[in-house]
Structure formats: C-alpha cells, structure tokens
C-alpha cells in the first residue's frame, strides 16, 4: 500500500532512533492523507505494527511508534483512528500536522499549495487533540502541535491532555528564545 515501503525502511533502521513517526497527514504528498481513512489505515497500521514487533524481537529494543494525524479529520474519523491506535498498541499520537483548510486566508493566498501552520491551526488542532485524549488509552503518549508560540498556547495543549509538545512555526517567527519564554513559567 501507499507509504508502506518507506515505513518499512524507517522501521528497519529503528534500532538507532528515539522514536518513529508515521506521518500519514502530510498535505504535500499526493494520496497520503487517504491512509487516515477506513480500511486503508487498518491495513497500514497492522502491517507496520507487525514489522515493528518482529524487529523489536531481533534488536531487543523497543522504539516507540507514533502516528502523526491531520487536523482536518471529522470527530468520527478521529474516533475510528483512536480505536485502531488502541487495537494495534501504537505508542503515541502527534496532534496535528498542518491544515489544508485555507478559509481563514485572504483570497490572494487561498490557492497556495501546502498546509497552513501556526496560529490559524490552533483551534482545529486543539479539537483533534481533545478527541484523541478522550479516546485513546491513557498509556499512549500524546504530542501536541499546532499554533504553539507562547506559554499560554503551550499550556492550553498541556491542559487538554498533551504529554509533550512540538513547535516549528513559533520558532520561525519568534526564534529560539520562544522555548525559554515557554519554559520560564
């Protein structure tokens, strides 16, 4: 299936990684987001998890496996994905990648390719984060991403239930000192 070859290569090298991200949500890869739906994701996670478990036996090392999801999923899709994350004992979820929803942009920017990140992503990302927190097993690691550029936005993700945070756009616009500002509180 789509994405399995790359995932196999990554998992085979997992003995040198701290964790592996299955990014099934990139808006820049044609048909990749289709993996988040129905039988596609079930088959994909089953195949990847089987390979992951086999390699864990070979290398005698558990490298956590996390799935990075899109903010554009419906609540029903997030629920179904949560059930599969539980079923296949996936270690964690990264909530979320960039959005393909450009409705908040002015007309002149709506046709630009790629995903929208940063502050415009916060509401959607937090909604998906909330659904994931409510539906995956408590032992899963939840990584909050999307619109983090201050202590307040970081704290909001943690208050919803994220265990860890990732940020990128905040670093681009505010520089590395944004990390110190967040950690100062």
Where are the predicted features?
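Short beta-strand/loop segments at the ligand-binding rim of alpha/beta enzyme cores
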Residues: 55-71, 132-144
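Single conserved hydrophobic/aromatic residue that forms the stacking wall/gate
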Residues: 1-11
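Hydrophobic faces of well-ordered beta-strands that scaffold small-molecule active sites
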Residues: 20-23, 65-69, 93-95, 141-146, ...
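Glycine/Thr-rich beta-alpha phosphate-binding loop at enzyme active sites
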Residues: 28-40, 84-138, 174, 178
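Loop-centered beta-sheet repeat module
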Residues: 12, 16-56, 68
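Catalytic cores of alpha/beta
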Residues: 73-87, 134-138, 148-165
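Active-site glycine- and acidic-residue-rich loops that bind
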Residues: 7, 33-41, 66-86
């Amino acid at each position: 299936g789509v994405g399995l070859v790359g995932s196999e290569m990554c998992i085979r090298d997992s003995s040198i990684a701290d964790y592996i991200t299955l990014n099934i949500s990139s808006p820049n890869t044609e048909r990749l987001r289709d993996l988040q739906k129905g039988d596609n994701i079930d088959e994909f996670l089953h195949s990847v998890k089987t390979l992951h478990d086999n390699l864990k036996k070979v290398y005698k090392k558990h490298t956590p496996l996390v799935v990075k999801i899109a903010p554009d999923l419906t609540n029903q899709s997030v629920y179904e994905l949560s059930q599969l994350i539980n079923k296949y004992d996936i270690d964690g979820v990264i909530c979320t990648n960039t959005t393909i929803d450009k409705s908040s942009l002015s007309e002149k920017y709506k046709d630009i390719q790629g995903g929208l990140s940063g502050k415009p992503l916060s509401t959607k990302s937090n909604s998906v984060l909330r659904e994931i927190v409510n539906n995956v097993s408590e032992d899963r690691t939840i990584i909050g991403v999307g619109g983090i550029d201050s202590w307040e936005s970081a704290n909001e993700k943690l208050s919803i239930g994220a265990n860890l945070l990732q940020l990128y756009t905040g670093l681009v616009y505010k520089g590395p000192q944004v990390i110190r500002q967040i950690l100062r509180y």
